[in-house]
UniProtKB/Swiss-Prot annotation:
This is Phosphate acyltransferase. The lineage of its organism: Bacteria, Bacillati, Bacillota, Bacilli, Bacillales. The keyword Lipid metabolism applies. The keyword Lipid metabolism applies. Keywords: Cytoplasm, Lipid biosynthesis, Lipid metabolism, Phospholipid biosynthesis, Phospholipid metabolism, Transferase. Catalyzes the reversible formation of acyl-phosphate (acyl-PO(4)) from acyl-[acyl-carrier-protein] (acyl-ACP). This enzyme utilizes acyl-ACP as fatty acyl donor, but not acyl-CoA. Gene3D superfamilies: Isopropylmalate Dehydrogenase (3.40.718.10). PANTHER family: FATTY ACID/PHOSPHOLIPID SYNTHESIS PROTEIN PLSX, PHOSPHATE ACYLTRANSFERASE. It comes from Macrococcus caseolyticus (strain JCSC5402). HAMAP family: PlsX (MF_00019).
Length: 326
């Protein structure tokens, strides 16, 4: 039985969407147990495979991450992370404060021996519906070439086991596709990735090609990765806003909007990265998944489903074995 620790109070719409997502998840899968951490008075789920763990504190979006983890010992997120550290559960998922969850992963659960820097990875949509994994998205603003090689190794294992890609391709985010393009970090990383035989490195990829499925995995430093993510997210949101404004501009366009409303919703859902689950924190000694802060129940369900798959494939053991050669 897979045991998943859930922070009941993480996210903009907690605890309602968290509980709704859990109910969907327990109904869909019978090989999982949920360990719910939060205020027991706010839990409305009575299920034989759900265990409630009462906590008295909450980490908010405004809290300073490391300070909150160290001072709020009875916070739902901290207690959930501790359960993974103590091997009482297999994974933790939260839609709460991203920095705090990363801090909980590092300082409560702990880093895998041999991993120098953790990385936050998220699967983003592509035009062909396959999606690609981007990392690092902000766990570390600065990185060395060796760190990016480790990112590529971890993501390759994950893509193979979780997404069923037999030989996932790895691209390096850069300002051009030529071998010598980019700053010193990009050039040095390119050379190391090219020499690494355990991954399928295909070279540099430009940001304009990402949504066209340039690679299964794209690695970069956390500063650049976060900029790419925010740019893609903002561009998609603004395109839909402009499209909506155009379609509501006149009677003629309103009629057209009514005719293609279903198709537009399908397109919007296609570009919603929460359809792929949450972001995974690579490099810590346990499965840590960050659901989107504004998740609805389906997005939280997808994050739980992602956790289940990672636990079923024993991803952490594989990372230890293949990345650190333990």
């Amino acid at each position: 039985m897979i045991k998943i620790a859930v922070d009941m109070h993480g996210g903009d719409n907690a605890p309602d969407i968290v509980l709704d997502g859990i109910e969907m998840f327990l109904k869909e899968f019978n090989d999982v147990e949920i360990h719910l951490y939060g205020d027991e008075k706010e839990n409305r789920i009575n299920h034989p495979r759900l265990t409630m763990h009462h906590t008295t504190d909450v980490i908010t979006m405004d809290d300073e991450p490391v300070r909150a983890i160290r001072r709020k010992k009875d916070a739902s997120m901290v207690r959930a992370a501790e359960s993974v550290k103590l091997k009482e559960t297999d994974a933790v998922v939260s839609a709460g404060n991203t920095g705090a969850l990363m801090a909980a992963g590092l300082f409560v659960i702990g880093r895998i021996k041999g991993i120098e820097r953790p990385a936050l990875a998220l699967t983003l949509p592509t035009i062909n519906d396959e999606g690609f994994m981007l990392l690092d998205m902000g766990a570390n603003a600065d990185a060395k070439p060796e760190h990016l090689v480790q990112y590529a190794k971890m993501a390759s294992i994950y893509a193979h086991k979780n997404r069923g890609i037999s030989n996932p391709s790895v691209g390096l985010a850069n300002i051009g596709t030529e071998d010598k393009k980019g700053n010193q970090l990009a050039r040095d990383t390119f050379n190391l990735l090219k020499e690494e035989t355990s991954i399928n490195f295909i070279g540099n990829v430009e940001s304009k090609a990402l949504l066209n499925y340039a690679a299964d995995i794209v690695v970069t430093d956390g500063f650049t990765g976060n900029m790419i993510l925010k740019t893609l997210e903002g561009t998609a949101n603004n395109i839909f806003k402009m499209l909506k404004s155009t379609l509501l501009a006149s009677t003629k366009t309103k009629i057209a909007a009514g005719l293609i409303k279903k198709d537009l919703m399908q397109l919007k859902n296609k570009m919603d990265y929460s359809e792929y689950g949450g972001a995974i924190l690579f490099g810590v000694d346990g499965i840590v998944i960050k659901a989107h802060g504004s998740s609805d129940k389906k997005a939280f369900f997808n994050a739980l489903k992602q956790v289940r798959q990672s636990a079923r494939e024993d991803v952490i053991s594989l990372l230890k074995q293949e990345v650190t050669h333990e």
